[in-house]
Each structure stands twice: as structure tokens, then as C-alpha cells.
């Protein structure tokens, strides 16, 4: 049996939620999976009933929920003798577990970057180091995150890089394909971002780039899919730049429509930056776009270079430099470079399929 304790899990949306959901589902091919997850909405039960996973939701006020959940996990691990591995999504999921109890099994904790990015010797950093001391292995989502972890005091010998997985591409239903084409109309280039509306994702510079590109490409269209605390600022900037026609902000759309929009775009654009402690540890959206034959432009800050093969499946630019973003877009759009990059991106994405990524976890568990 595999046991997963996670703060992030479907049906809640997000990169970590997709990661933990995909990992749990993929591990089912190798044995039973027990999931302890936070209860965050009324949709949780309906989603869990459709799943083949054994999911136990822990409810209550967030402050107290983590202690209740740790107690439940401690008791479960104590009573079971057939647990092959205990996998945690976050150092906080490990923090309050009893080291004496969980030492009976193999403990793996995942790290993603921004949740560990606190100054060395700060109170948060000390909590992280203490929590990680309970883990047999720390799985990093990228080379960038691994180096960050080492710099912040996590034992190098404990860290193993396993990139996040993606599902194999799905066939797009005709109605969603048609709807996406109605959104894009006869535009060119068709540019898309799928990300939360946060400063580190680079939306502000994207809008400025679209404004500058408009003179050369009057039929340009940019679609942003996602919600977040920067929404009001970005919609205001969009109006100020006179881009109401060229830009569409979408949120809470059907996943099939999201996929159709990605598939029918020419370029996936997310020139990430470091915003205070917040940084993109990997960038699974680049790989998801690649799986549908769409090339990407990502930022040099963070782990995008593991998700994009520079000059082959896309480009890495300086997300803080408007000229760097603009010239990267031009380079891909000119001479239809996006088609060549897109074909390579689709091939590149196959190494991230869950059936291959989960095998890395199985091999890791066997090696511990």
C-alpha cells in the first residue's frame, strides 16, 4: 500500500493539485493507494465517489485541521504493516507527523520551490529543515528547486529530481474545438497563457508585448486562462493599452475548452519572474502545451529550463526585460518557427507522461 498525505488534491485546481492527483492515480497500477486530503469544498465528496482511490478527507478550521490530519495519519501508519511508502506533498504535511511512528516506513517529501524559499536560519527555514529530517528522500521538481534546497540547508544526499508528470493528450471534442476557434477567430498569432494571475507569471509584460506587437500583427489575439489576485490590475492595464479586442481573460472554463484553446494556439507564453520569495519551480503548463504540439516561451528565473528545451521546443527569455520577451515572440512567429518548435515539443513532452514518471517513483521507493 502507498499512503499519500496532501494539502493539495483534485477537484481543487492548480499545478500541485494536478501533480498529487496524477501521482496517486498512477500509483494505483502498482498497488492500493490511501489518500489523506484536506476537505475544502462540497465538490470534494462527489469527486471522490468517482475515483478508484481510497480518499479520506479531513475537515475543520485550517489552523486546527493540520493537527487533526497529522493525528489521523500517525494512527493509520501505526496500525498498518504493509505500507510501501508514505508520500507528502509539502513540508507542512510532514511537520507534525511523529518521527518514531513514520520511521517504520519509507518517507518521501516533495518540494516545489516557493514553499521552501525562506532565508537561511529564519524561523520558517528552521521548521523546514526539522521537518525534512524525518524524510528518507526529498523529491525536487526541477534542477532549480534542488539547488535552492541545497542553498537553504536541505541535505544534498537526500534530494532526488523527479519532474512532474502529465496525462497523455486527449482527443478534443468537436464542440470545444469549434468554441475555441470562435474565440480566436481569424487571428494571428494566437498566443495563450494558462496560469494564475500572479505577478511572477509575467502577465503585465505580456500585455505590454501584445501592445507592441499589434502594430506589426494587427490581427493578434492573446488569451489568458486563470484567476488570481492580479485580475483587476491586469484588466485595468488592458483597457489602458487599448487591447480590449485583442485580449480575452477567461476563468473557470471547462478543461476540454482549455485544452482546445491550447491546441489551436501558435504559442504558449509565460515569461516568469521572481516576485519576492515567489518563484516558478518548474512550470508544468509548458509541458502540457508541448504535448499538444505548442511551443513555449518561459522566463529564465526558476525551473522553466527543465520544461522547455531552449532553441528546440521553445525559448527561454528574461521575463523582466520587455525587449527580451518581444524579440523572443518575434523569433518564434517569424518564418513559422513555432511549427518546427511545436513538433519537437510534442516529442519532448512524452518523457513526462505519467506512466514513465511514476516508474521513477517506484524505482526510488525500491532503492530506499
Write out the residue ranges for each language-model feature.
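N-terminal strand-loop element at the rim of the active site
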Residues: 6-13, 19-67
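Conserved donor-binding/catalytic core segment of Leloir-type glycosyltransferases
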Residues: 139, 183-201, 207-210
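Carbohydrate-associated surface elements
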Residues: 144, 165
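A short, well-ordered alpha-helix in the C-terminal region of glycosyltransferases
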Residues: 189, 219, 337-351, 363
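Conserved acidic donor-binding segment of nucleotide-sugar-dependent glycosyltransferases
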Residues: 309-311, 315-322, 331-336
Amino acid at each position: 500500500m502507498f499512503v499519500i498525505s496532501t494539502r493539495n488534491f483534485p477537484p481543487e485546481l492548480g499545478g500541485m493539485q494536478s501533480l498529487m492527483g496524477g501521482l496517486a492515480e498512477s500509483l494505483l497500477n502498482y498497488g492500493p493507494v490511501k489518500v489523506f486530503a484536506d476537505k475544502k469544498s462540497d465538490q470534494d465528496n462527489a469527486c471522490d465517489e468517482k475515483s478508484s482511490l481510497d480518499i479520506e478527507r479531513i475537515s475543520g478550521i485550517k489552523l486546527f485541521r493540520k493537527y487533526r490530519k497529522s493525528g489521523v495519519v500517525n494512527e493509520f501508519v501505526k496500525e498498518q504493516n504493509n505500507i510501501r511508502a508514505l508520500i507528502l506533498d509539502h513540508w507542512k504535511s510532514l511537520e507534525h507527523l511523529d518521527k518514531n511512528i513514520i520511521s517504520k516506513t519509507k518517507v518521501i517529501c516533495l518540494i516545489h520551490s516557493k514553499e521552501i524559499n525562506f532565508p537561511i536560519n529564519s524561523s520558517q527555514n528552521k521548521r523546514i529543515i526539522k521537518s525534512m529530517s524525518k524524510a528518507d528522500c526529498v523529491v525536487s521538481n526541477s534542477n532549480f528547486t534542488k539547488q535552492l534546497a541545497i542553498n537553504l540547508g536541505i541535505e544534498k544526499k537526500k534530494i532526488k529530481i523527479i519532474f512532474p508528470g502529465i496525462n497523455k493528450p486527449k482527443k478534443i471534442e468537436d464542440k470545444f474545438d469549434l468554441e475555441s476557434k470562435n474565440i480566436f477567430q481569424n487571428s494571428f498569432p494566437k498566443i495563450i497563457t494558462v496560469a494564475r494571475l500572479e505577478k511572477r507569471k509575467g502577465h503585465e509584460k505580456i500585455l505590454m508585448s501584445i501592445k507592441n506587437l499589434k502594430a506589426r500583427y494587427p490581427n493578434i489575439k492573446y488569451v489568458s486562462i486563470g484567476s488570481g489576485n492580479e485580475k483587476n490590475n491586469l484588466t485595468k492595464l488592458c483597457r489602458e493599452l487599448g487591447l480590449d479586442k485583442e485580449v480575452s481573460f477567461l476563468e473557470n472554463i471547462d478543461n476540454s475548452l482549455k485544452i482546445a484553446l491550447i491546441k489551436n494556439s501558435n504559442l504558449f507564453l509565460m515569461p516568469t519572474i521572481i516576485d519576492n520569495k515567489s518563484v516558478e519551480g518548474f512550470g508544468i503548463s509548458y509541458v502540457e502545451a508541448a504535448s499538444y504540439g505548442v511551443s513555449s516561451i518561459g522566463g529564465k528565473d526558476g525551473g522553466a529550463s527543465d520544461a522547455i528545451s531552449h532553441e528546440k521546443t521553445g525559448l527561454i527569455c528574461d521575463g523582466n526585460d520587455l525587449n527580451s520577451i518581444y524579440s523572443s515572440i518575434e523569433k518564434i512567429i517569424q518564418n513559422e518557427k513555432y511549427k518546427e518548435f511545436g513538433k519537437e515539443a510534442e516529442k519532448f513532452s512524452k518523457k513526462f507522461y505519467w506512466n514513465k514518471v511514476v516508474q521513477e517513483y517506484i524505482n526510488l521507493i525500491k532503492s530506499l
